[in-house]
Amino acid sequence: ETEAPVEVAVWTNEEGSRFAPAMVASGVFAGVFDLDYGLSRADQDGLTMGQELDRIGYAGDQPVGKPVGAYFEAHIEQGPILEDEGKDIGIVTDAQGQRWYEIKFTGVEAHAGPTPMKTRKDALLGAARVIDLVNKIGLDRSPLACATVGMMQIHPNSRNVIPGEVFFTVDFRHPDDAVLADMDKALRVGVEKIASDIGLKTELEQIFYYAPVPFDESCVDAVRKGAELGGFSAREIVSGAGHDACYLAQVCPTAMIFIPCVDGISHNEIEEVHKHWSDAGGQVLLHAVLAKADEIVMQKSD
């Protein structure tokens, strides 16, 4: 029995793949988004998150948000560093910032045969140039920057029609908010120039942003001591992915524990961890939670 109560949280829609943006549930809990905003997020078919929660019986009636003494989140690294260095545990000190964009280019649909190259307003050509631009933005700010075009919809998507409309997404990440802002500027300037050169109409919207998140020093130290108690090899690491902990950090002391994953692969069917890594992560999580629970009780009694 712990000195302070311990609860397990399972957050809805952490990835944001169907209902963008990511981490909506923890964001609502932390007050970053209001409840109506979260429930109104719609997928590509127009179904809202609220409707789907009702359909599967997951719509709750409890008030949103409550006091939390501390929050710890265990996760696979989703990258290769821990495995490459032979470390059992990643002591996560920070999470890098993110910006998500949705971009739509509108050109003119036309026949692929009779339409001369010089007169085309090819929306897909514009998107292709932006993909190259996004890659360059990331490479120019390496090794810490990440820049990805991960989703694309082409209309009319016919082999003999010049695409008249293309929708696609951009994902920027960096641990320095100033660099992230510079990446944002480079994207906006580049997109406008590409659209102008080809004669396209442009819609660009940033749909998701959070600044780099430093985790609570006392919670990070609890993770570090947990690794030492278990005799596990460990190193400090910055999270390259977004996690619910990033929003919980706005309302309570927070830290994360990483374990390795095979070949650093994640978001793939072959994602895998070894049992001894999971065991190590579980033991460190237990040590950190118990230590912080005792600390919280002692602080309340002072």
Where are these regions (language model features)?
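Short, small-residue-rich loop/turn micro-motifs
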Residues: T12, I103-E109, C252, F258-D263
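Zn-dependent metallopeptidase/amidohydrolase metal-coordination segment
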Residues: G164, A234-V284, V289-K292
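Midchain, well-structured core segments that form catalytic/ion-binding scaffolds
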Residues: N13-A178
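Flexible, glycine/charged-enriched surface loops at secondary-structure junctions
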Residues: T2-P5, G60-V64, P114, K136-V149, ...
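A short beta-alpha structural unit
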Residues: T148-N157, T169-D176, K201-V220, C246
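Short amphipathic alpha-helices in soluble, non-transmembrane regions
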Residues: M183-E192
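Short beta-alpha connecting loops at secondary-structure transitions
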Residues: D36, R173-D177, I207-Y209, G264-W277
